[in-house]
């Protein structure tokens, strides 16, 4: 981190001099003077930083270099300020507790800024209800919002400059960004989640995504912080300006709102870039599947947040001889190569995973990954220096006590959970014991199957293969899932989530579907097969009918066979499903094929009715005709059941 002076408003008044001297979110880092200045940045990046300095008026500017020394200083400063707490049970692991109001993505305050509303979102719902596929803000309203929030918002704090790469810097699919922020927690997390360092600075030119973030709590404070966590929740704004490749975030320190390389850049901005440039930026995991014979295939899978992407990407298969390797657990950038193969990279270099439910039983590889160099946020704390959350099956010694994510004593049986349902771990990807040897390959890996999925407690079979590309795009557009804790929606409500991108579209969702349809028309494309899975079917007593976790390898093995052209499927009105006996259920007592593949006419009649209503309400005239034709085809097949 290089020391820069000038252009910043000094802090004055309010807090004690001692508090200011100690740093308050890392101000103390400014005492280390290094030789390099903003001259290390190209002119466009310098202009961006200087613009942010004039607007936000920070105390000083610090250019991040990604060094180990820099990381240690950030950790020391955050520990001194009470933001991070060491976890001595593990190696270089830390706990952060946020303000209880700052715990998830804020979809209602996340906007796309375009001159024309139709560029960002489909027509407003005819019913007058809230839009489901994104929020639009006019350029004039955006400028007013910036002027209401940002002038002087970093007073008394340092402004950190983070040049970063999404994807291996040498990859033809890599994209660069520069984030400025007043949060050292964000700097530490971005060092894990993206590629930061000299290799990025060497490649940085005028073509980069501009990311401005502030927690919105200038010094001196006018009211005390909660959990030493700065945020200003009432005027939160997460804005994306696709035409300028710019992201502006204010008021939240939570990762989904502040780590701007993640959903903001890698999905919202990148999906618009992908549409313009002929590739795909998707909310998908990437994994490699190796059969007992040694043949390997790569698959991508789109699930809504907290629906099992990380567990699937890091799965330990229950089938002997099968192996899984992880390329990425959340985001895939995919582009056809000159031979027509769809190649994918993971643009991230870390995991920002949901902690609750993660255990040595459900995901032993994740547990191994997070045992060192990890930042935990809003998990419970054990008196032996370990962490705790619902579903963690680690034994504890007698006498060990617990502190909840709210900093209060907690015991088993208490009505409130010890860890927040959306508590997170942030860990380097290369610590995962099953990372694929090609996970960092600049050329990417070839994708042979794309899988859609969500939480559907009834009616939707365990696995279905699309009849073809167009039908598969329809399946992706028709995805529905129970809401999770990853956003501010209440869990349990069944929500439409096309392609698991509902919160992440970077442009009009109808045109997004058109882009997917046109992808299938490429003359030389070797298109992946498309599937839909549902691990979450329940019986009439509410019990899961599929054991999930490592047994999901049985479904992947069937998909593997379909990629090879095996005749193991039978047609149904909704797609191809495994023939009875062709999905390996050996050693699963009580698992009933008929329960895994329900085909109820009444359910699908209602599903079609609700889907037609949803399309009309949320896509309107922007729904591609081919998608409506697929719905009409499904309705006709269901009528004949």
UniProtKB/Swiss-Prot annotation:
Entry's EC annotation: 4.1.1.32
Annotated SUPFAM superfamilies: PEP carboxykinase N-terminal domain, PEP carboxykinase-like
Keywords assigned: Decarboxylase, Gluconeogenesis, GTP-binding, Lyase, Manganese, Metal-binding, Mitochondrion, Nucleotide-binding, Transit peptide
Binding site for phosphoenolpyruvate: 105, 256, 422, 424
One matching Pfam family: PEPCK_GTP
Cofactors, names only: Mn(2+)
Gene Ontology, cellular component aspect: mitochondrial matrix; mitochondrion
Pathway annotation from the record: Carbohydrate biosynthesis; gluconeogenesis
Catalytic activity: oxaloacetate + GTP = phosphoenolpyruvate + GDP + CO2
Binding site for GDP: 306-311, 356, 455, 535, 544, 549, 552
Coiled-coil spans in chain: none
Assembly: Monomer.
Other comment: In eukaryotes there are two isozymes: a cytoplasmic one and a mitochondrial one. In birds, PEPCK-M is the sole form of hepatic PEPCK, but it constitutes 60% of the enzyme in the kidney.
PANTHER family noted in UniProt: PHOSPHOENOLPYRUVATE CARBOXYKINASE, PHOSPHOENOLPYRUVATE CARBOXYKINASE [GTP], MITOCHONDRIAL
Family: Belongs to the phosphoenolpyruvate carboxykinase [GTP] family.
Identification of the protein by name: Phosphoenolpyruvate carboxykinase [GTP], mitochondrial
Encoding gene per record: PCK2
């Amino acid at each position: 981190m290089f020391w820069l002076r000038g252009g910043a408003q000094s802090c004055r008044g309010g807090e004690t001099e001692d508090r200011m001297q100690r740093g308050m979110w890392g101000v103390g880092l400014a005492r280390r003077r290094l030789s390099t200045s903003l001259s290390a940045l190209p002119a466009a990046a310098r202009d961006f930083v200087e613009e942010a300095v004039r607007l936000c008026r920070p105390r000083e500017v610090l250019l991040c270099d990604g060094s180990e020394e820099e990381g240690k200083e950030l950790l020391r400063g955050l520990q001194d300020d009470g933001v991070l707490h060491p976890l001595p049970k593990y190696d270089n692991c830390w706990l952060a507790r946020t303000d209880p109001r700052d715990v998830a993505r804020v979809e209602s305050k996340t906007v796309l800024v375009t001159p024309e509303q139709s560029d960002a979102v489909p027509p407003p719902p005819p019913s007058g209800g809230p839009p489901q596929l994104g929020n639009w803000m006019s350029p004039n309203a955006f400028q007013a919002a910036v002027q209401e929030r940002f002038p002087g918002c970093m007073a008394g704090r340092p402004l950190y400059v983070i040049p970063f790469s999404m994807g291996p810097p040498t990859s033809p699919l890599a994209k660069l960004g520069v984030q400025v922020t007043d949060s050292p927690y964000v700097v530490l997390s971005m060092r894990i989640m993206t590629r930061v360092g000299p290799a990025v600075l060497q490649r940085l030119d005028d073509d980069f995504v501009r990311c401005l973030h502030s927690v919105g709590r200038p010094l001196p404070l006018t009211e005390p912080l909660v959990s030493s966590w700065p945020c200003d929740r009432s005027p939160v704004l997460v804005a994306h300006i696709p035409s300028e490749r710019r992201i502006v975030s204010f008021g939240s320190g939570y990762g989904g709102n502040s780590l701007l390389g993640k959903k903001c850049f890698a999905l919202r901005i990148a999906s618009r870039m992908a549409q313009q440039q002929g590739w795909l930026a998707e909310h998908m995991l990437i994994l490699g599947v190796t059969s007992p014979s040694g043949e390997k295939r790569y698959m991508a899978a789109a699930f809504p947040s907290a629906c099992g992407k990380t567990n699937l990407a890091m799965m330990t298969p229950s089938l002997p001889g099968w192996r899984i390797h992880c390329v990425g657990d959340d985001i895939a950038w995919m582009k056809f190569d000159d031979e027509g193969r769809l190649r994918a990279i993971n643009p991230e270099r870390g995991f920002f995973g949901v902690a609750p439910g993660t255990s040595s039983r459900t995901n032993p590889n994740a547990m191994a990954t997070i045992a060192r160099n990890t930042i935990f946020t809003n998990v419970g704390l054990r008196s032996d220096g370990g962490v705790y959350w619902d579903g963690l099956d680690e034994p504890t010694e007698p006498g060990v006590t617990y502190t909840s994510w709210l900093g209060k004593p907690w015991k088993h049986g208490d009505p409130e959970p010890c860890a927040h349902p959306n508590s997170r771990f942030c860990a380097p990807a290369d610590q995962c014991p099953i990372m694929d040897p090609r996970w960092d390959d600049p050329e990417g890996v070839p994708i042979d199957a794309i899988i859609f999925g969500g939480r559907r407690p009834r009616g939707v079979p365990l696995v279905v293969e699309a009849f073809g590309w167009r039908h598969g795009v329809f399946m992706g557009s028709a995805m529905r899932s129970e809401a999770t804790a990853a956003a501010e929606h209440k869990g349990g409500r069944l929500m439409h989530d096309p392609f698991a991108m509902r919160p992440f579209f970077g442009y009009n969702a109808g045109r997004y579907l058109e882009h997917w349809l046109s992808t299938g028309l490429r003359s030389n494309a070797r298109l992946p097969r498309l599937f839909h899975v549902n691990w979450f079917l329940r019986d009439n007593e509410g019990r899961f009918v599929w054991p999930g976790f490592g047994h999901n390898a049985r479904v992947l093995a069937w998909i593997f066979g379909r990629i090879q052209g095996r005749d193991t499927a039978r047609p149904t009105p909704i797609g191809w499903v495994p023939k009875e006996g062709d999905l390996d259920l050996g050693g699963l007592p009580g698992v009933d094929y008929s329960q895994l593949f329900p085909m109820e006419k009444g359910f699908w009649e209602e599903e079609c009715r609700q889907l037609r209503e949803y399309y009309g309400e949320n896509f309107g005239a922007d729904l591609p005709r081919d998608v409506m034709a697929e719905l009409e085809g499904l309705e006709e097949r269901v009528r004949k059941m």
